[in-house]
Each structure stands twice: as structure tokens, then as C-alpha cells.
Amino acid sequence: MAVVAAAAGWLLRLRAAGAEGHWRRLPGAGLARGFLHPAATVEDAAQRRQVAHFTFQPDPEPREYGQTQKMNLFQSVTSALDNSLAKDPTAVIFGEDVAFGGVFRCTVGLRDKYGKDRVFNTPLCEQGIVGFGIGIAVTGATAIAEIQFADYIFPAFDQIVNEAAKYRYRSGDLFNCGSLTIRSPWGCVGHGALYHSQSPEAFFAHCPGIKVVIPRSPFQAKGLLLSCIEDKNPCIFFEPKILYRAAAEEVPIEPYNIPLSQAEVIQEGSDVTLVAWGTQVHVIREVASMAKEKLGVSCEVIDLRTIIPWDVDTICKSVIKTGRLLISHEAPLTGGFASEISSTVQEECFLNLEAPISRVCGYDTPFPHIFEPFYIPDKWKCYDALRKMINY
């Protein structure tokens, strides 16, 4: 009871500080979010809340795919969809509000360009959207379905797990729906709270027959999405919605592909392997810089990119070299995909490990609203875990 009372008292002080409008450092706030600064305007506060926990780091400008154009992530998704519709006359895009451009504007202009028979709205029924997509794909056409938020993909869980993933196997490959791609905005955004912030990739990692992909940047998003659309298996493509406008870089105008199930070593190192995907990649890149500056520690940074089937070889090769592994994701710790990576690595690389594998993830609670800054695995939490590994 004493612990509960202390926690309640801390929360009341936090609310009081907010009501007075002069946030200050509160006891027990921790390094990650100890300082809460006064906001000049509501808009300033919202902007700070959205981008405070990471700094987007663009990739080098690609030169092997022809002319490029600066795009943010939602524009790169639009470009990929535009390329697919232009290349494949059977391709169709559908979902809630898709014909109007979607809530994040990823399909803006496509209905006007390709017609209402190829880009169209659906009722608000996720199970129906995916079931409809399976039917389209079974005919041999290319189906690109949008679930408006990853948090609302669960009504379609049965259609994805028991129908789409198994269709080829239960028919002996007489029929398949491999030309189905399901897009969905994913992850925290700064103000999404319970129903617009979740990272459900681990739910689908236990489902053989589908592929799950999460990009970290506009360049990656376009190349990986095109690969998903062209892949012969049903794919779920989760798009980090906080990066829709926070991330911008040079992206090729013409179509190109980035291979699925191949992790990318973004930065080579010798002391610790850092693994993440989506937005969290930018967090661990900052952690790698902090470790180099403050501790003299060399970190190898890896973007997993494809959750299932994941690239075991690249991760294990790195851990054999460094002897230490830290995995970070926004989803809750228990049952998160970091657990699968950790289990596999300790089986394959046990004698090479110099310290226990560390998982820095979200808490085992529903995603909070005003306490999101405390919930997310920011660079300070990752840095503290890395320091403990080095000192083990």
C-alpha cells in the first residue's frame, strides 16, 4: 500500500505541476523524461511531444536508381503505390477513406489518376477489408488493402491468420492469395494513446505463411513496399506514422526494390550489437553515438526491417563479433519479438556472449496518453542498459 500511495502522490504532483503551467523536475522522474519544459503554445507542446524521443537520421542519397526527389515517408508510400498501379493493371487499392487520400494522405490523388474502380473506399470493417482482399488476390489480381491504424487490425486477425496465411498450404498450392499486401500505420505518434499507438508485429510473428515488414525511412519504405506488393506471399507492411512527416530524404522517382528478410548493418562496430526496426532504429543510432562519445564503445547498429521471416544470419554474425546484444522495440516487453531474437541468439551464439542479452522495450501496460514519454524506450533507457552490459 505504501508503494501505491507513493506512486499516487507522485502522479498528483505531476498533474499539479501541469495545471500550474511550470513543469519542473520531479523526484523519481528518471533521466529519460525528467525535464518537462513549459510550452509557449499548445502547438509547440504537441510538436515537442511528437519528436522528442528521437532524431531522424536520413540515409545517404541513393545514386543507383536514377533521379531522386525529396519526399517524406507518406509521400514515398504514395510514390510506391503510384508505381504499382501504373505497372500492374490488375492492382487495386482499397480501405477506409482511401479514395479521399486516407487519414494520413498516403493515397491522395490516386483515385483521380487511376479511377474509382481501382482506388476506392470500403465500409468500416477490417475483417471485411482483408477478406475482400483475399478474394481479389485469389483471382490473380494484386490487392493492396489499408487498415487505417494497426491498432484496429485485430478484427481482421482471423482472416489474416486462418485464411490468408494458410490459403496456399490448405489447397496444396492450387490456390493462393500471395498477391495480397496489407498496409497499416503503426507505432507511437506522440499523442495516440490507447488505440492509435500500438505495435502489434509480434502477434503476427507466430503466423507462418505471411511476411511482416517495417521500414525506418522514406527510401526504405518505398523499396520495401514495392517488394511486398510483388512478393508471392501475403505481406503486412507496417508504416511508422510518426515518420510520415518527421522523416524526409531523397527518394528515387522510379520503382526499385529492397530485398525482404535481409537485415541491414547501418553502422559497423566491435563491442555491442544494437538491433531495432522502424522508428526505434533512429533511437539506437543516437545511443551508438552516445556510447562512442561517453564510453569509447563501438556499436554495430542493425535494422531488422523484416520481422518474419527474419534474418538470423546477419544478427548472429554480428553477435559472434561483438559478444553483446541489445534489442529495442516500442511494443511491450513480454512476448515482444525481442524475445524471439534473444532466444535464437543464445541458442546459436551462447559461447560468444560476454553479457546477458538486453531487451529495452515498452512496459507491460496499455499504451498511455500523457505518460507516453515515460513509456517509450528512449535513448536514455537504451544507454543505461548498454552501460550495464559493458560493465557486466
UniProtKB/Swiss-Prot annotation:
* Positions annotated to bind K(+): 178, 180-181, 228, 231, 233
Name the GO cellular-component terms.
branched-chain alpha-ketoacid dehydrogenase complex; mitochondrial matrix; mitochondrion; nucleolus; nucleoplasm
> What are the names of the required cofactors?
thiamine diphosphate
Outcome of altering residue 176 to Y?
In MSUD1B; uncertain significance; loss of 3-methyl-2-oxobutanoate dehydrogenase activity
The record, for InterPro entries, names: THDP-binding (IPR029061), Transketo_C/PFOR_II (IPR009014), Transketolase-like_Pyr-bd (IPR005475), Transketolase_C (IPR033248)
- A single GO molecular function, which one? 3-methyl-2-oxobutanoate dehydrogenase (2-methylpropanoyl-transferring) activity
Which residues are the transit peptide here? 1-50
* Name by which UniProt lists this protein: 2-oxoisovalerate dehydrogenase subunit beta, mitochondrial
Q: Which organism is it from?
A: Homo sapiens (Human)
- Upper lineage ranks? Eukaryota, Metazoa, Chordata, Craniata, Vertebrata
Gene name of the encoded protein:
BCKDHB
